A protein has these predicted regions:
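Residue-level signal for transmembrane alpha-helical positions in Major Facilitator Superfamily
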Residues: 24, 39-40, 76, 117-121, ...
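Transmembrane alpha-helix boundary and packing residues in multipass membrane permease domains
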Residues: 30, 34, 46, 63, ...
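Short alpha-helical transmembrane segments in multi-pass integral membrane proteins
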Residues: 1-27, 84-151, 193-249, 305-370, ...
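Helix-terminus/linker motif at the lipid-water interface of multi-pass membrane proteins
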Residues: 35, 39-57, 126-133, 189-196, ...
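N-terminal transmembrane alpha-helices
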Residues: 14-46, 50-51, 67-79, 83, ...
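Transmembrane helical elements of multi-pass membrane transporters/channels
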Residues: 24-44, 145, 179, 208-212, ...
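Small-residue-rich hydrophobic transmembrane alpha-helices
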Residues: 56-116, 153-172, 266, 279-343, ...
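Short runs within selected transmembrane alpha-helices of multi-pass transporters and secretion channels
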Residues: 77, 146-164, 172-180, 201-214, ...
Length: 450
């Protein structure tokens, strides 16, 4: 039985420190991590974009593969982290350690599964994700490197989220940002100095993932955490593993549908050539960079929601939700406004192709307008998953990239052609936020007042 007294100060910080200050404290390191991750994703797009338009399109195709890997990683990561934060809020450290070890090793096994079977089926997988004949050679080379990094990528998602849900976002930031900075350096080395082409971008990403993985693992080895990844805590029974998976289903739904929507988007855009695929890929990466601001703050709110819900401090859950919503909307509003005004320059930075720029500008404008609606849906998703409302979290997480986006994309691309493809995500964002409203009202009406 692990003594609670050793971790008393961490518990008191999570349940007593003023909520706005705590969200900023936990959210800023996460936001920095998200920004760096987005920057190195955009760095790949920038350096690959110097090759040609087909290579630039390949980054959009492989983005679908990375979404699949992240879907599984986040399922185990958010599933484990959400349960851990509530267990720690209840001062049950033993159970938290069992969840942490089980989630980590399950993710590691899943990563090796992707490495083996993904490597064997890489060509049909790239075609399924929307690759054209001209994009395929670039996509295959890039994807093979990503698949080699699958064990690290998937299990890193678990370690990162365990650290965040414990309230140790700074340690998570060290691992992720170090890997991100290294990725950018290796991109320059492999692609500009050694002229390795898109293979260099893939190798840079793979090496960086393993370095990040090693740094995150070091935090657990050095016992900087309340939880442990020691094999003795593994508990692969149906109850434990099932609880992790069902709690993490919203993340699997969100990221899995992101992969499917990327595949459908690439296939729809492919009708208009490689330039359209490249343009939409660039727009998505820019949007994700802006989106990382509110996502970082939202992830800072997650451990606070889980800890305090477990400790029955419901007023702090309320305060956290509304502070995150207001702060996130302000951040995203400012960032979206700046990008809206400089849309052409932003796209040109990644690929100086008139056709790519022409297609990308309207899509980026639409995204910037719709991003004002995103903080509300993010706050809902983060809160419901953190407190164990599995149905609400899974359903709402499925909307933005799936239940709303996919039908809108299919209908709009048929009716409005290219313009429909350019605006589909923006329309889906507005729809998603509107659907979230009744869930939010019902939850806070029933939440005890303490």
């Amino acid at each position: 039985m692990v003594s609670y007294g050793k971790y008393k100060s961490q518990y008191e910080m999570m349940t007593q420190k003023p909520v706005p200050a705590l969200i900023v404290q936990l959210g800023l390191p996460t936001m920095v991590s998200m920004f760096v991750t987005s920057i190195y994703n955009m760095a790949d797009s920038y350096f690959v974009g110097q090759i040609n338009t087909s290579a630039s399109g390949a980054t959009g195709v492989v983005l679908g593969l990375m979404a699949i890997l992240q879907a599984v990683g986040f399922m185990f990561g958010h599933g484990s982290g959400s349960i851990i934060s509530r267990k720690l809020g209840q001062k049950d450290i033993d159970s938290a350690r069992k969840i942490a070890a089980t989630g980590f090793y399950a993710a590691l096994i899943a990563g090796f599964f992707f490495l083996i079977f993904g490597g064997l089926l890489v060509t049909p997988l790239m075609r399924l994700l929307g690759s054209t004949d001209t994009i395929l050679p670039y996509a295959r080379a890039y994807a093979i490197c990503i698949l080699c990094a699958a064990p690290a990528l998937v299990s890193s998602c678990v370690m990162n989220n365990i650290l965040r849900y414990e309230g140790r976002a700074f340690f998570a930031m060290i691992g992720l940002t170090s890997g991100g900075v290294l990725n950018i350096f290796l991109d320059m080395l492999f692609m500009q100095k050694l002229n390795m082409g898109i293979l260099g971008a893939g190798l840079a990403t793979a090496i960086s993932q393993y370095v990040s993985w090693a740094l995150l693992l070091t935090m657990f080895i050095l016992k900087k955490t309340q939880t442990s990844l020691a094999p003795k805590y593994i508990n692969f029974n149906i109850s434990t593993l099932g609880d992790i998976i069902t709690t993490g289903l919203p993340s699997l739904a969100r990221q899995g549908l992101a992969s499917i929507s990327t595949m459908l988007l690439n296939n729809a855009a492919g009708v208009y050539g490689d330039a359209a695929i490249a343009a939409m890929s660039i727009v998505n990466r820019i949007s994700m960079f802006i989106f990382s601001a509110v996502l970082g703050i939202g992830q800072g709110f997650q451990p606070i929601a889980g800890f305090n819900y477990g400790a029955k401090k419901y007023t702090r859950v309320r305060q956290g939700f509304f502070f995150t919503l207001i702060f996130g909307t302000l951040l995203l509003g400012i960032a979206s406004f700046i990008v809206f005004l400089s849309a052409g320059n932003c796209i040109q930075f990644f690929r100086d192709d008139p056709e790519v720029i022409r297609i990308g500008i309207p899509a980026l404008h639409a995204q910037c307008i719709a991003l004002f609606f995103v903080p509300f849906q993010v706050c809902n998703n983060m809160m419901f998953q953190s407190i164990g409302y599995k149905f609400n979290a899974t359903f709402l997480s499925s909307l933005r990239n799936g239940l709303c986006f996919i039908p809108v994309l299919l209908v709009f691309s048929f009716v409005f052609k290219l313009a429909g493809i350019q605006t589909a995500q923006a329309v889906a964002d507005v729809m998603t936020s509107l659907i979230c409203i009744p869930f939010t009202i019902k939850f806070f009406a029933k939440l005890p007042k303490e």
